Amino acid sequence: MGKGIDGLKLKKRSEKLAFMEVKIGSTSSYCRLEGFTTQAFNANASEYNRQYVDEDTERTDVKGYSESINYNFDQYIGHPALSEIVKITENELTGTDAVRNILTVDMTSNTSGGQYEATLSAFAIVPSSNGDSTDCMTYSGDFKSRGTKRAVQVTMDADFENATIVGGSTVASQSAKSTEKNVEVKK
């Protein structure tokens, strides 16, 4: 049996945090997505499959991705990010009104400067169901990719409730450009 991983630390699911861009007043802030019972990432890779006449096996290439995140959460009244998703669901928002930027932060990538590696993407919030529990109000659906994913560096507040993008890379895709001027950016 292999023992190469015996001395290594296993990465916990709780060490990958998500933050949604929420407009508060005249600025936007990345608020932590809390209260989620499911946040499953799906690559949804597009494939090009073919078999050449002189070969007995197929060949496969990945030609693109359409990432989605399946979600379920318990509603906490007054939580800004959850309130955004509830607003989109309850008001049946469509088009760019249902698009939000989401940061996914790797908490194991902390540097000596207090920065973390993260990815920034614009997602369409696609609601599925709500109210399917008698324990509390629940919502479910999918965040579906709306463009190119971008690598960024972020800092966190003391409680890990808010993330701030470091530098000038705030745009995840063209659909997110309208919020670029309102995002707090540290330089």
For each predicted feature, which ranges?
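Short, low-complexity, polar/charged sequence segments that are solvent-exposed and flexible
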Residues: 88-94, 121-125, 142-144, 161-165
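Short secondary-structure transition/capping segments
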Residues: 9-16, 146-160
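Residues at beta-strand starts and edge strands
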Residues: 65-69, 97-101, 137-139
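Solvent-exposed edge beta-strands and adjacent loop segments
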Residues: 2-77, 123-135
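Intrinsically disordered, low-complexity terminal/linker regions enriched in Pro/Ser/Gly
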Residues: 154-187
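Short, cysteine-centered beta-strand-loop-beta hairpins and adjacent loop/turn segments enriched
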Residues: 76-82, 149-153
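Short, acidic/charged, Gly/Pro-enriched secondary-structure junctions
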Residues: 82-117
